[in-house]
Each structure stands twice: as structure tokens, then as C-alpha cells.
Amino acid sequence: MNSNFRSLMIWGLIALFLIVLFSFFNGNRQRASNGEVSYSEFLQKIDNNELKTVTIQGQKLTGQTADRRMISTYAPRDPGLVQRLNTNKVNIRAVPESSGNSIFLNLLFSLLPVLIIVGAWIFFMRQMQGGSRGALGFGKSKAKLLTEAQGRVTFKDVAGVEEAKQDLQEIVDFLREPQKFQRLGGRIPRGVLLVGPPGTGKTLLARSIAGEANVPFFTISGSDFVEMFVGVGASRVRDMFEQAKKNAPCIIFIDEIDAVGRHRGAGLGGGNDEREQTLNQLLVEMDGFEPNESIILIAATNRPDVLDPALLRPGRFDRQVVVPNPDVAGREKILEVHVRNVPLAPNVNLRVLARGTPGFSGADLMNLVNEAALMAASRNKKVVTMQEFEDAKDKVMMGAERRSTAMTQEEKELTAYHEAGHAIVALNVPVSDPVHKATIVPRGRALGMVMQLPEGDRYSMSYLWMVSRLAIMMGGRVAEELKFGKENITSGAASDIEQATKLARAMITRWGFSDMLGHVAYGDNQDEIFLGHSVARTQNISEETARMIDAEVRRLIDDAYKTATKILKTQNKQWLALAQGLLEYETLTGTEINEVIAGKPPSRTQGSDTAPLRTSSVPKIGAKNSKGASKSGDAEETEPSVGTKATAASSAKKVVKNASAKSAEKKASGTQVKAATPAATSIKATSAKVASAKAETENVASAQAATENVAMVKAATANVAKKSVESAQADDAEKKRLEEHNKSAHNKKGNLTAGAASNTEDEK
């Protein structure tokens, strides 16, 4: 705002000055053209009494007529002029003659237009060059010195790239203690090239080196060298290294060096390439006749394949540090860095988020945290919950929802069956990533989608996985054909077909997955002219081989189509159920998809349109509605109580009735079953006291009904044991035998069936 206002003020002052100057020159010219007369005419007007006043200024005479018109002339040396004026009764005014100011003003007025033109040219060039230092500042380096005011970044602010940090730590140590390395004859790398995909933190790593080493740090972009004038790029490279030598030891960071370091000899035509001249100067400065010790050049690029080989050789870029996408542990650390200033709810689990975001870069994770914070603020929440993180993850991965898109019922049905086909095939192929979410709500440029998330980071793909992936891609088109007929299929599978063709061709031409073509790479000629490669390259694929490649690609896709057709016909009920579920709920998570195809409604919280916070890629531990599992877990934590014969007998009667009705898989599923285990072996010896223990049956039944509450079971069992001990008159040997048997009953769950059978016989 200030710079715009300043520019506006400058333009306004220039315009005002030009207007005043024009008025001044124009007025003088008009006055000069209207009042100039000859000396004879001036004398004649005096004699004719036409002049009322005459002003004498040296040799200049200025007269005023009766009608107030001004005339002027230059008089020679005329001694009788004053007498003549007095004779004609003319009012005489004498003005002292001016000094050399008139000469100066005349010179100024003559040079002023030239000065204005030169000033305007300088102003325009400064604007075009982005504020270069003066009109002759084109060749000056545009490298900026990073200061503390711009924020100090250290290695603590960089996470997820531990190997890269270790490689760069040596540079920091050298800048701090150069004698440590020089004592053993070591030489620090003169240049370090950071290579990695976009968003992995290459620039942040460079800034952290400057913060750790505490040395001057110059930063410049690769596009800041070459501009409109010839020779500017090379001049800026020289000036940049001259500034670095004055501030040595220091670091120079060139971001996106591929803009200036591309392979030489690229392009068509024989004209001069300013970029090549700049690159040559950079090569000389990095490793030429003049050594540049204590100057470390760090560069970053995501296109190392297009760089000139001379730039990558040892002595210039001695070390190449790869900065890949982070793994699970790295993503968790990156999330911890980005949530430092974000208030989180207690249910936020960064480990779960890291597992559910495979392939995310550091920039993607930063965007994820920012989107979650914005969603929480728009929902008027004081903290960011796990729901916001899940919604933000879906928005980043699948695109923003477009619920305003008007879709007809026919389009919704077609989309639902299409996406259900993808999901059912994904659930039934041999190898596949878990289904994370299926939706028919338009997101991004798609009307619907099925999202799959791998359970972990994948670094290689198997043949079976690729074939299964092809079948999943064909699932949507197969579903349309089976449901609506071949004549009613739509263009909705265009993206699926394109991706399937690309994958199948890569399987044949790059990865050798064809028995007919063998383990040979048949790469297409995709090299671009301006990447420094030769224009004319021979294609090593014959027409017959090209036809074979097309046939093999067609075969893989046809096989995938048949596989998808077979799966959807076999799992027809599940497919139809899932399609109806999508029409009803619009969006289903992986867990909800399994519930829908099993004939159950999705377990969602009432009054909420959103899905529960769980995904198939990050499953929850334990089942939510599995009562048997929860009972068995409680039973394992509860120790069996010591009961008397009467208590054991009454407990055995209750448990045996349940055990005979249940399957053998639910052995030892409750606390009462465990408590009945020692009783089952001693039921014959205690049958005489069964009648006296029947009074405690109600207490045991109430304890059995409360098996989910471990504390209540323990209290009820202790109460039963206490009352049974008081009523029982067993001898000490019998009690000792029962206690020993109870201790060993934990590891003898298999005796339940035999004990239950003996109990049944005794009861009869």
C-alpha cells in the first residue's frame, strides 16, 4: 500500500511539474511574440504620445500603452532618449540591470527537458528491474542476505529427514570448527545439491543450516540471473561471489538451480544463449583458477536429470543429498512441529494421522494442519478435534465437496453403482489396499470416488498388486454395463481407462511383465528438445514390436475386465446393497462399507451426518459392539475366587445350562465359568450339600448377569464365598484340595466340557 501510494505521488509531482513548465514557456513565448518592436517604432510611439510609462533596464526598454499593452525593444547608446521622454511627458521607471542569473536561468530552461527525459528513463528502468541500484545496477547480484529479522530456523524446526540432517551437520561443524577437519587433511564439500520432490523441505533445510552455523547466508533464485540484457547473468554471478568473499565464511543458496543450470547445447537455432553464458561463469566461480575456500554453495532442485554434467561433478557439487517424502515416523514428527501453536483436543492422535497419510510431503502435512485449524474455527470450536483432521485429510486427498452441484436421480444412481463396483472389486481381489472411503458427493472434478489408503509406505509393487489394481479400475465400467446395459454406459470411466492403460503399458514396456516381450525395456521417445538432448534420436522399437506391445496392453486390460465382471456377478448382493447404502448415506467409510454389505446399518452417532472417526487404513483396536470379546477380556483380568462345595455346585448348575446351549468356541467366556471350573471336578464329593447352598443361587445369578462389570463380579463372588464358607462344614483336607485345584484351573480351560457333562449326569 505504501509503495503504491509513493509511486502515485511521484507520478503526480511529475505531471504537475510538466504542467507548470509548459505554462511558463508558453507564456514567455506569447509575451515575446506580442511585445517585440523595433527601436524606431518605439521612438515613433513616444513622439505620438502612445506610451504612458517606459521602464529602462540597461539596454532594454519596456513601454506601456494607454490600453495597457506592453511593448519592448533594445536601445542603442542614445544620450537624448531621456530628454525625448521628458519632452513627451512619459513616466520614466529605471530598474537595475540583472546579473548573471539570466544566463543561469536560460541554461537551466534549455537543459531542463533533457534532464526530465533522463530522469523518467532511470525511473522506468528501476521499476522494470525491481529496484536495481541505479541505472547501472543491472550487473549487480540480486542475492539477499538473510538476517535474524526474517526468523531464525534451526534443525529443531526440521523433522522427518534425519538422514539429510546428518549429512548437512558436517557442513555446520566445518563452519564452526574448520581446524577439526583441516588437521586431518579433510576438505569440506564445496557444493551440496539438495534433490527431492516438491514440498519435502529443501529450502527449509538450507535455512536451518544458516541458523545452526550462524554465518552470513545469501539466498537467490535461479531465475534471478538471466534478464533482458546480454551479459547480465554472468555479471551477477561474479558480483555474487565477490560479496560472498567479503563475508567469508558464508553460505550461498540457489533455489531452483535448474532454471540456470540446464544441460548446455539445448534448443534449436544458432543464436546466443544467455543462460549458457551464465552457467559457464557459475562453473568457473565454483571451481576455477581462483579458489573460493570457506564459501559453500547449496542448491535445491526437483529436476536433477536436466542439470549439466559439468555442474554435478566432484569439486563443484561434491555431495548430493536426497530429501524424500517422510515415512510414518517422519510424518508424525512433522505433525508435532506444525501443531505446536494449535490447541488440540484430547482425542487427537498424531500417530494415527501419520499412518493415514502415506505419501504426504512436509508441505502437505502443513496444509493438512492448517485446513483442520480453519475448519475448527469455522465451526466455532475452541480446540481442533480428530474430526477436523479427518475432514481436512479428505479435503486434501479427494478435493473439496461440491454439494451445490445439481445431479439428477439417474446420475446419482449411476454414480452409486459405479463407485460400488470399484469398492466391491477392491474388497475381493487377491491383493489390494484397504478401502478408506466411498462417496457419491462430487469432490474436485469427480462426481464420486472410492479412496484407498495403503496400510504402510510402499516402495515397490508386485505383479499381483498391479493386476488387482487394473481390475479395481475396471470395476466402475463393469458395474455400469451389468446394471444399465451395454448401450447405457457413460463416459464416467474415462479417468479409470486412462489410468489403467498407463499402468498396463508401464507393466509391459518398463517392468518386463510380459512373457511374449521378455525382460526388455521398450521406452518411448519422450525426451524434450529443450532438456539438452539431441533432437534426432533413433527409435529402437519396430512396428511389429509396437503392435505386440499394444496387444499385450489390451490383453492385460481385457483380463482385468473379466476379473471385475466375475467378482461383481459373484458378489451381486453385496454390490447392490452397497449401492443402495451410498444412495442413502452418500458417504461411507471402510468400516461402514463392511457393515452395509453385511446387512447392518452403519454405526453412526445420532444427529450427526459425519462418519465416525475410524478408517480402514487405521483400524481401531477391538470391536465396538462385540460383547463376547469384552467379556473374555474382563474374565482374563479377574482371578477365580475360592468357593465352597455348595457354592461351586450351585454355580455349576447355572453355567452348565449356558455352556450346553453355546458353541465350544465360547469356552471360559465369563467369570462364573471360570469359578465353576474347580467345582466341576468336585461335584460328586459335594452333592450332599447342594440343598444347603440353593439359598445362595439368587446371589450367584445376579453376579452372573453383571459379568461386564468386573468389580461387581468380584464383590458378588466374594459374598457368595463368605456365606458358603460359613454354612459349609467341610474338613480342612477338602478345603486344601479345592484351593490347589482353583490355582491350576487358569491353565485348564479344556476341562470345561468334561466337567459340564459330569455335572449334567449328577443333576439327572
Curated annotation (Swiss-Prot):
Keywords: ATP-binding, Cell inner membrane, Cell membrane, Hydrolase, Membrane, Metal-binding, Metalloprotease, Nucleotide-binding, Protease, Transmembrane, Transmembrane helix, Zinc. Its cofactor is Zn(2+). Zn(2+) binds at H418, H422, D496. Disulfide bonds: none annotated. Residues 641-662, 669-685 have a biased composition (Low complexity). GO terms for molecular function: ATP binding; ATP hydrolysis activity; ATP-dependent peptidase activity; metalloendopeptidase activity; zinc ion binding. Binds 1 zinc ion per subunit. One of its GO terms (cellular component) is plasma membrane. Acts as a processive, ATP-dependent zinc metallopeptidase for both cytoplasmic and membrane proteins. Plays a role in the quality control of integral membrane proteins. In the central section; belongs to the AAA ATPase family. This is ATP-dependent zinc metalloprotease FtsH. It comes from Bartonella bacilliformis (strain ATCC 35685 / KC583 / Herrer 020/F12,63).
